[in-house]
Amino acid sequence: MEEFKGYLEKGGFKQQHFLYPLLFQEYIYALAYDQGLNVNASTFNEPVEISGYDKKYSSLLVKRLIKRLYQQNSLIHSVNNAKQNRFVGHNKNFYYQMISEGFSIVVEIPFSLRLISSLKEKKEIPKYQNLRSIHSIFSFLEDKFAHLNYISDILIPYPVHLEKLIQILQCWIQDVPTLHLLRLFFHDYHNWSNDITITTNKSTYGFSKDNARLYRFLYNSYVVECESIFVFLRKSSSYLQSTSFGPLLERTHFYGKMKDIGIISCNDFQKPLGLFKDPFMHYVRYQGKSIIASRGTHLLLKKWKSYFLNLWQCHFHFWSQPSRIHINQFAHFSFYFLGYLSSVEMNPSSMKSQMLENSFLIDTVTPKFQTLIAIIPMIGSLARAKFCNLSGNPISKPVWTDLSDSEIIDRFGRLCRNISHYYSGSSKKQSLYRIKYILRLSCARTLARKHKTTVRTFLQRLGSEFFEEFFMEEEKVLSLMLARTSYPLHQLYREPIWYLDIIRINDLVNHL
C-alpha cells in the first residue's frame, strides 16, 4: 500500500487523478490473483513467456487487451449480435474478467488510503475484535430495539442505471480514462445496454460470479450513496455540532463501528462535553435489506417512507414501489433478518409494594427482544440442498453415496455443528432440534442407501455412538463457556448465546 501511495502522490497531485496508469502495472494483477495464470497459452495465440513472466500477468498483455477492447468496440456494436462472444479468436469473457479484476484493485486504492489516513489521525488505533461478526448486530438490536415503537422494513430497490453508477463513482474518482474504460466495459459485457441490476437474480448471476470483486465494489458504492443522507441527519439530530464524524462507508473487512458517544465542543463551555447522541431513528442493513426503527410516532415513519421514495425516484431515476417499505408497530410485528425471525415480546410481571400499613400490587411490562429460527425458509433451504422434502421429511443424499462412511458422517456433522453454531442465539431451541433431527436422519438414510439396507437395521448395527458426532463438539464448547456459572447446563442452553466469530451468514439461509 505504501508503494501505491508513493506512486499516486508523485508531483503532489491528488490521488484519484492517476488511477489509469496503474492498470498497466503487473503487480496490480499479482494482487488480484494470488495464484498464477491458469490459462493455456493458445488463448493469446502466442506463448506466455513472450507476454512477460511465466504464469504471470504482464503489462504488455494488459496493454494489448485494452487496445483490442477499444479497437473492437465499433465492430461489436455494428454487428449487434447477442450471441457473439469472441474477439477474433480470443475469448471475450476472459478479456473482461481480467480487466475487471485489475480495475477493482486500482479503484479501491483511493478508498483504502482514505481509510488508513483517517485511522492514522487518531493517536491510538483501537483493536476492534469481533466487531466484524454478524452476530454483533444482534447485540445492538437487543440493546436498542426493545425500547422502540415502530419499525420500517425496507428492501433496497433495483435496478440502477448504468450511467448512474458512473456518476456515483465520478464524485469520488476524477480520472477520466478510468471512468471511460469502466463505461466501455459495462456496455460491452454481455451486450448490456440498459441496466445493471444490483441483486442476485439470473440476469446478473454471471456478472457477479465472474467479477465478484467489482460487483461488490459497485454495490457498496450504490448503497453508500443511498445511505449518505444518514450522516447529515445524524449530525442534525444533535443539539450541538460534533467536532468530527466518521464516514459512513461499508467495507468487506471494516475496522470499527460508529459510537453512540460523540465528543463535542462549544465556546460556552470550557471543557469538551460528552453528548449522548440518541437519534430519532436506528438503522441496520445487511446486503439488500435494511431496517429503520424509531421511538417516534407513525407519522414520523410515514415521512421517512415518503423521503425514500422521492430519493429513489428523483436521484436514482427509477420508480420504486411503495410496497417495498413496510411500517409496523414493534409490539405486533416480526421481521426476517440474517436468518432469524425477530420481534419484541412483552413479558408481564407483578411486584408487591408496601407503604406503611398499605400494600398493593404493581403490574409492569418488560420488553424482551426475541430471535427465533425462521423454520419454514430453513426447511426450504434444506429441501433445495436435497436433505429433506418440502414437508421437512428427511431423505437421503444420493450424490454423497460414493464417499466413504467417515467422510459422509463428517460432512453431515460439520454442517450440523455450523448451523447450531450460527443459530445458538435463538430464544427457543425447538426449531434447532428439528433441523438437527433432519440432518441426523438424512445422514442415516444416506449411509443405509449406500450399504443397500434399511435405516432401522443400519442404526441397530452402529448403536447410539453414531450420533455423537452431532452433539459432542457443541456440548464441549458450551460446557467450557459456562463452567464458572452455578446454573445447570441444560437451563443455560435455552438462553441466546451469540458467537462473535461468525463473519458470514450460513449458505443455507442466504436467500433471507
Swiss-Prot record:
The lineage of its organism: Eukaryota, Viridiplantae, Streptophyta, Embryophyta, Tracheophyta. One of its GO terms (cellular component) is chloroplast. Keywords: Chloroplast, mRNA processing, Plastid, RNA-binding, tRNA processing. It holds the Pfam family Intron_maturas2. Usually encoded in the trnK tRNA gene intron. Probably assists in splicing its own and other chloroplast group II introns. Signal peptide: none annotated. It is found in: Plastid, Chloroplast. One of its GO terms (biological process) is mRNA processing. Its main location: plastid. Belongs to the intron maturase 2 family. MatK subfamily. This is Maturase K. GO terms for molecular function: RNA binding. InterPro entries: Domain_X, Maturase_MatK, Maturase_MatK_N. The keyword Calcium does not apply.
